[in-house]
Curated annotation (Swiss-Prot):
It comes from the Bacteria. Transmembrane segments: none annotated. The keyword NAD does not apply. Residues 247-295 are annotated as: Disordered. It comes from Rickettsia conorii (strain ATCC VR-613 / Malish 7). Disulfide bonds: none annotated. HAMAP family: Ribosomal_uS2_B. GO terms for biological process: translation. InterPro entries: Ribosomal_uS2 (IPR001865), Ribosomal_uS2_bac/mit/plastid (IPR005706), Ribosomal_uS2_CS (IPR018130), Ribosomal_uS2_flav_dom_sf (IPR023591). Gene3D superfamilies: Glucose-6-phosphate isomerase like protein, domain 1, Helix hairpin bin. Belongs to the universal ribosomal protein uS2 family. This is Small ribosomal subunit protein uS2. Keywords: Ribonucleoprotein, Ribosomal protein. One of its GO terms (molecular function) is structural constituent of ribosome.
Length: 295
């Protein structure tokens, strides 16, 4: 039986997930996810991060298990390569450079751009066809192809709307989120202390700037998707040895209903005692280490 990945307080602390933004930059809607503040920086309540990450990973797992498609989105510099790496690892789709307005809500136009990209690819790979073009024309075609690839490389095999959107940095990717909301596509997102969690179905309180944190999130997301894929293949009677080949081709579309979940775990009774104790101890240890360094 497949096991959905899990994460603990220590792993989140080591990745710097608990560091929010300066208190002056916070979004009051994130109040219930904030533990406190240290040196004018908000500290995220990692007890809730652990609990809500589990809910989000289950959503990813269930989506892929039911042959759904996931679109990973983050166009910020520090996340761009990581998003592409892990989306490809689990055979899903991604946008990691620029979100083109209408990528979800005006799919017909985007599909037309993908068709142009595929035609350019076909032409540039055909040596015989290239003999009919000048060097300048070939150079222009190559430039057009490279420009299209920046925005479309991760979705060129996506033939319909995704079943789940996974976002890092909701402020930067607000257009993608708005389009997903219009189409009733569920959203998993890392929400930092300056974020608005309102339209996020599966919020994960955490730092959305640290490269270590982003890599940790994406690794967990990809592992959950791969576990879902494994279950999907077993149910279909597919040879597990062929799983990687299947992944490379992408998944077929199927509507996946939103999972019931609780967004906020502000009451300690919703957090197991072991996680609560671990978080409190970790913060105390951090304070003691800081005090000893300053002594």
């Amino acid at each position: 039986m497949s096991k959905i990945p899990s994460v603990n307080i220590k792993a989140l602390l080591d990745a710097g997930v608990h560091f929010g933004h300066k208190t002056s930059r916070w979004n009051p809607k994130m109040a219930s996810y904030i533990y406190g503040e240290r040196d004018d920086v908000h500290i995220i309540d990692l007890r809730q991060s652990v609990a809500l990450m589990s809910v989000a990973l289950n959503a990813i797992y269930e989506t892929v298990k039911k042959d759904g498609k996931i679109l990973f989105v983050s166009t910020k510099i520090q996340a761009s390569d990581i998003i592409a790496e892990y989306a490809e690892k689990c055979g899903q789709y991604y946008v990691n450079h620029r979100w083109l307005g209408g990528m979800l809500t005006n799919w017909k136009t985007i599909a037309g751009s993908i068709e142009k990209l595929n035609k350019l690819d076909k032409t540039l790979e055909n040596e015989e066809a290239l003999m009919g073009y000048t060097k300048k024309e070939i150079l222009n075609m190559s430039r057009k192809k490279d420009k299209l690839l920046l925005s479309l490389a991760g979705i060129r095999n996506l033939n319909s709307k995704p079943d789940l959107l996974v976002v890092i940095d909701t402020n930067k990717e607000h257009i993608a989120i708005n389009e997903a909301v219009k189409l009733n596509v569920p959203i998993v997102a890392v929400v930092d202390t300056n974020s608005n969690p309102d339209n996020v179905d599966y919020p994960i309180p955490g730092n959305d700037d640290s490269i270590r944190a982003i890599r940790l999130y994406c690794s967990l997301f990809a592992d959950a998707a791969l576990q879902g894929l494994e279950e999907s293949m077993k149910a279909s009677g597919v040879d597990m040895g062929a799983m990687q080949e299947h992944t490379d081709k992408g998944l077929t579309s199927k509507n996946v209903s939103k999972l019931k979940q609780t967004k906020k775990f502000s009451k300690t009774k919703n957090i197991d005692e072991e996680t609560n104790t671990e978080f409190e101890q970790a913060l105390n240890d951090a304070d003691e280490n800081k005090n000893s360094d300053n002594a």
